[in-house]
Amino acid sequence: MSANPLDQFRISTIFKLPDIGEYNIDFTNASLFMVLSTFLISLSCYVGLRKESVIPNPLQSIIEIIYDFIVSTIESNVGKEGLQYVPLVFTIFTFILVCNLLGILPLGFTVTSHIAVTFAISMIVFISVTFIGFKHQGTHFLHILLPQGTPMWLAPMMVLIELFAYCARPVSLSIRLAANMIAGHTIIKVIAGFVINMNIFLTPLPIAFIIILIGFEIFVAILQAYIFTVLTCVYLSDAVNKH
């Protein structure tokens, strides 16, 4: 076991691929777990929904619970008009959730602990919301940069402030997710290392404490996917509903 709790976030190359110009596109452990997450989501949806029944199987029940959650979140934040974007929000939620949970498993790797991954997901949300905003509202979408009732003399400053806040959305989304995943996994690693070094691994108290921490980390993994999804729906509301 590595003594450094941050080594679990180290990206390592599984096999090399030809570079594209100056860009390295080697297949890494991060690539593996993103592919694995996508595969598990696709397989679960296929198997769970292949034979829908009145009395759902456990996998179908989980998928339906997630789907109902996405629908209710969109309806409460965006309205009925936002239901056309259920596939987008469902994909984002399930991908983040599965990536978070895979990182908790032994020998797992938490891809959402890397800002490059979380920023890429956040940029997908940012670009999609911006496109949807202009699709629904046209140039009226730019009114988001100027709150209603703003005095004319204050308008230029408010536009700059709101533009900065709008462009900062993907940054705040990505940092929030990555920081929380790093913090949770690091704490578990530190405490587990302390328990092993003190040779008290087989005593009940530290084992129970680690189990509680892992349970808490599962809760955090679900919570962070939930927060990311809710914020995505809030941003969708700005794009779909006129101000």
Swiss-Prot record:
<feature type="transmembrane region" description="Helical">
    <location>
        <begin position="29"/>
        <end position="49"/>
    </location>
</feature>
<comment type="similarity">
    <text>Belongs to the ATPase A chain family.</text>
</comment>
<keyword id="KW-0375">Hydrogen ion transport</keyword>
<feature type="transmembrane region" description="Helical">
    <location>
        <begin position="114"/>
        <end position="134"/>
    </location>
</feature>
<dbReference type="GO" id="GO:0045259">
    <property type="term" value="C:proton-transporting ATP synthase complex"/>
</dbReference>
<keyword id="KW-0066">ATP synthesis</keyword>
<comment type="function">
    <text>Key component of the proton channel; it plays a direct role in the translocation of protons across the membrane.</text>
</comment>
<dbReference type="InterPro" id="IPR000568">
    <property type="entry name" value="ATP_synth_F0_asu"/>
</dbReference>
<dbReference type="InterPro" id="IPR035908">
    <property type="entry name" value="F0_ATP_A_sf"/>
</dbReference>
<comment type="subunit">
    <text>F-type ATPases have 2 components, CF(1) - the catalytic core - and CF(0) - the membrane proton channel. CF(1) has five subunits: alpha(3), beta(3), gamma(1), delta(1), epsilon(1). CF(0) has three main subunits: a(1), b(2) and c(9-12). The alpha and beta chains form an alternating ring which encloses part of the gamma chain. CF(1) is attached to CF(0) by a central stalk formed by the gamma and epsilon chains, while a peripheral stalk is formed by the delta and b chains.</text>
</comment>
<keyword id="KW-0406">Ion transport</keyword>
<dbReference type="Pfam" id="PF00119">
    <property type="entry name" value="ATP-synt_A"/>
</dbReference>
<keyword id="KW-0813">Transport</keyword>
<keyword id="KW-0997">Cell inner membrane</keyword>
<keyword id="KW-0472">Membrane</keyword>
<feature type="transmembrane region" description="Helical">
    <location>
        <begin position="221"/>
        <end position="241"/>
    </location>
</feature>
<keyword id="KW-0138">CF(0)</keyword>
<feature type="transmembrane region" description="Helical">
    <location>
        <begin position="54"/>
        <end position="74"/>
    </location>
</feature>
<keyword id="KW-0812">Transmembrane</keyword>
<keyword id="KW-1003">Cell membrane</keyword>
<dbReference type="GO" id="GO:0046933">
    <property type="term" value="F:proton-transporting ATP synthase activity, rotational mechanism"/>
</dbReference>
<feature type="transmembrane region" description="Helical">
    <location>
        <begin position="141"/>
        <end position="161"/>
    </location>
</feature>
<keyword id="KW-1133">Transmembrane helix</keyword>
<feature type="transmembrane region" description="Helical">
    <location>
        <begin position="200"/>
        <end position="220"/>
    </location>
</feature>
<protein>
    <recommendedName>
        <fullName>ATP synthase subunit a</fullName>
    </recommendedName>
</protein>
<feature type="transmembrane region" description="Helical">
    <location>
        <begin position="177"/>
        <end position="197"/>
    </location>
</feature>
<dbReference type="InterPro" id="IPR045083">
    <property type="entry name" value="ATP_synth_F0_asu_bact/mt"/>
</dbReference>
<dbReference type="InterPro" id="IPR023011">
    <property type="entry name" value="ATP_synth_F0_asu_AS"/>
</dbReference>
<dbReference type="GO" id="GO:0005886">
    <property type="term" value="C:plasma membrane"/>
</dbReference>
<feature type="transmembrane region" description="Helical">
    <location>
        <begin position="89"/>
        <end position="109"/>
    </location>
</feature>
